[in-house]
């Protein structure tokens, strides 16, 4: 089995974190985003994975060598000399994706969910047509492109309606697909969109189906969604009774959904939760309050600080009695002074903040 992950460009929406690492390597719940996806593909029997990128991927190549060995898989980088949108990368990787008759998976690198690849493969083989897209149900379909089925058919797609004014359905494209290699004949090697060009052609030939995703789904490509996705992921681990979570019986855990790396140090009289992820080698002082936040590797939160709806970047320090909230994001190695208030600040790497940030701003 084969899979292609659409990684794309520089991850500008997730800056300042992506100024330090490519977006797929940023840790989501203490594991790089791309590793969540690679593990799910491997579990479904995938042995060849292509990462479609449009910049030199040296950092990722080095990082992923370990996982090639660990899972006995082959990871190749398909580097676009010009951005090829969402369908062009499939054609560029035709040598691998089309090397045999078996179907292949395609997914966006920003999507987090309970990846249903095994079930998707079974469903796809059962209907026997060219492609299947995973769809998720949303409460406000008018913000999205909606998938509409053929009358009298539970899964065959009839059309797509972009940001519908009146209700036509509530299923949207979840950014995960499975195709037979014959789809590659439909795609030219140029910048071309899978959603706007390839899918309508498949629909016209009655060759495209949808598969309903159960459970949570989030595109975590920007900070507010990264935090929301963290909450959804931790809640799903709680539902499954996962051992990855810190037991709610720990005196500092409040409201559950807390994941703390074993190497992190937690001070006295802290209140942590709900929805908090603490990475390796993090140091949390005494009397700290953490809620709906992510502390990345090597960061420090000093005594009595309050951190809410915030991503604290690698090796950053939050001072005593400081208060961070409202989707604040600290890049790598940022220092927030004692008693400083940051309201929705996006702070670039290596900065030191000595004055309050009262309104959301980018601090360069």
Curated annotation (Swiss-Prot):
Q: Does the keyword Ribonucleoprotein apply?
A: no
Its EC number is: 2.7.7.13
The record's Gene3D superfamilies line, in alphabetical order, gives: Hexapeptide repeat proteins, Spore Coat Polysaccharide Biosynthesis Protein SpsA, Chain A
Named in its record, the pathway it takes part in is: Nucleotide-sugar biosynthesis; GDP-alpha-D-mannose biosynthesis; GDP-alpha-D-mannose from alpha-D-mannose 1-phosphate (GTP route): step 1/1
Q: What's a GO biological-process term for it?
A: GDP-mannose biosynthetic process
Under the heading PROSITE patterns, the entry gives: HEXAPEP_TRANSFERASES
InterPro entries xref list: GMPPB_C, GMPPB_N, Mannose-1P_guanyltransferase, NTP_transferase_dom, Nucleotide-diphossugar_trans
**Which CDD domains does the annotation name?**
LbH_M1P_guanylylT_C (cd05824), M1P_guanylylT_B_like_N (cd06425)
Broadest EC class assigned to this enzyme: transferase
Its GO CC terms are: cytoplasm
Q: To which protein family does this belong?
A: Belongs to the transferase hexapeptide repeat family.
Database matches in PANTHER family = SUGAR-1-PHOSPHATE GUANYL TRANSFERASE
Name of the featured protein: Mannose-1-phosphate guanyltransferase
Give the species. Answer: Hypocrea jecorina (Trichoderma reesei)
User: Which gene codes for it?
Assistant: mpg1
């Amino acid at each position: 089995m084969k899979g292609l992950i659409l990684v794309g460009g520089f991850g500008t929406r997730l800056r300042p974190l992506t100024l330090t690492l490519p977006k797929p390597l940023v840790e989501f719940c203490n594991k790089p985003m791309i590793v969540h996806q690679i593990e799910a593909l491997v579990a479904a029997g995938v042995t060849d994975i292509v990462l479609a990128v449009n910049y030199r991927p040296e950092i990722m190549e080095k990082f992923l060598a370990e996982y090639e060995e660990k899972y006995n898989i082959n990871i190749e980088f398909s580097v676009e000399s010009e951005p090829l949108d969402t369908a062009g990368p499939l054609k560029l990787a035709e040598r691998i994706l089309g090397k045999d008759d078996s179907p292949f998976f395609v997914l966006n690198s920003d999507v987090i969910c309970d990846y249903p690849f095994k079930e998707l493969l079974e469903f796809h083989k059962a209907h026997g047509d060219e492609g299947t897209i995973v769809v998720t149900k949303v409460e406000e379909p008018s913000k999205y492109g909606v998938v509409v089925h053929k009358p009298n058919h539970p899964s065959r797609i009839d059309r797509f309606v972009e940001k519908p004014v009146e209700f036509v359905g509530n299923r949207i494209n979840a950014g995960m697909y499975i195709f037979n290699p014959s789809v590659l004949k439909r795609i030219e090697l140029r910048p071309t969109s899978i959603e706007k060009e390839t899918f309508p052609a498949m629909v016209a030939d009655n060759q495209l189906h949808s598969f309903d995703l159960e459970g949570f789904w989030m595109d975590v490509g920007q900070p507010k969604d990264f935090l929301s996705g963290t909450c959804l992921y931790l809640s799903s681990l709680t539902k499954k009774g996962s051992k990855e979570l810190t037991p709610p019986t720990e005196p500092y855990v409040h409201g559950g959904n807390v994941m703390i790396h074993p190497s992190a140090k937690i001070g006295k009289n802290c209140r942590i939760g709900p929805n908090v992820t603490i990475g390796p080698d993090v140091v949390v002082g005494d009397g700290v309050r953490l809620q709906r936040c992510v502390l990345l590797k090597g960061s420090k939160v000093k005594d009595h600080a309050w951190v809410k709806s915030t991503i604290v970047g690698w090796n950053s320090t939050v001072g005593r009695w400081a208060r961070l909230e409202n989707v604040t994001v600290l890049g790598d190695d940022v220092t927030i002074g004692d008693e400083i208030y940051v309201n929705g600040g996006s702070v670039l790497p290596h900065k030191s903040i000595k004055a309050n940030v009262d309104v959301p701003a980018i601090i360069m």
